[in-house]
Amino acid sequence: MRIKLLEQVRAGCKTVAEQATHIQIDVDRIPAYAAALPISEARRPAHDPECHYLNHGDDTAAFFLTLDAINFGSGYFPHLRKHTGRSGYFTVAGCLTAHFKENRPLSARDLIRVNAADCTRIFAQDPSNAPIRELMGLFARALNELGAYLHTNFGGSFTGLIAAAGTSAERLMQLLVKMPCFKDVAQWNGVEVPFFKRAQLTAADLALAFNGKGPGRFEDLDHLTIFADNLVPHVLRVDRILHYPVKLRSRIEAGELIAAGSREEIEIRACALHAVELIKAALNESGQPINAMTLDFLLWNRGQQPTYKSIPRHRTRTLFY
């Protein structure tokens, strides 16, 4: 019997967490930490309407598929020209929203043709900045892949792709990870460790945007894991659930890039994902049913607070977050 994608994610990350040599989970602190989380604050997450193209039907679905195709670049964000008071993610989302409003929604054919110079213009970036040139090239590559995939398999229809998932977030993931830019899988000690961060996040974003209806109706959202990036692990480290060795902390605080696919980088993501699975289990056992997606929103938004933003988090230049 074929193991489902989300079971593969959980199993791979559990294996890494149990054998990790760089990152450790403070399992003993999890029950108290879980009990202290402000769960009520996470019950009704919502997209910021200033930074997301909401309430436009099929064009909103197209917006989120497009946004999540390029929902990466945190390792480049120190070089990103950001909107005042906005993070890298909200800057990118806000620029894409402005393009959809002021020009027109991008079609699959548009995505096939887009290049790095177009991305530099859409996201209002400085083409003389070498890391940003690299990021805009990666954005163009990811958008080209999405456009070609939609054109070849769904007649260029964004909603055709979503409909093919048949109200299953996991099925949508299966469709998305056929594109290389979504195939978020690492190798660790000979073990394949899938994360599929952006593929999972696409389903969650659509569910939020459409209030669980139409293109946002997925019957298995409770099966999603967290969306393993560099912010949720950072929050868990600051909150003393994850422990990093002194040498790694020093590298991160010095702004040194952590190589994509390195043992440290994989362990950071995998241990964060597994730690949230343990937090979820502790909450469920205490009579507070919650899913990993909701915990991700809570922890990610906690990471926007000044306390967390003032402490450097790991930076990795990758297509996946």
Where are the regions a protein language model picked out?
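Phosphate/adenylate-binding glycine loop and adjacent helical scaffold
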Residues: 1-196, 243, 247-250, 303-321
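A mid-sequence, solvent-exposed acidic-amphipathic segment
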Residues: 184-185, 189-195, 199, 206-218
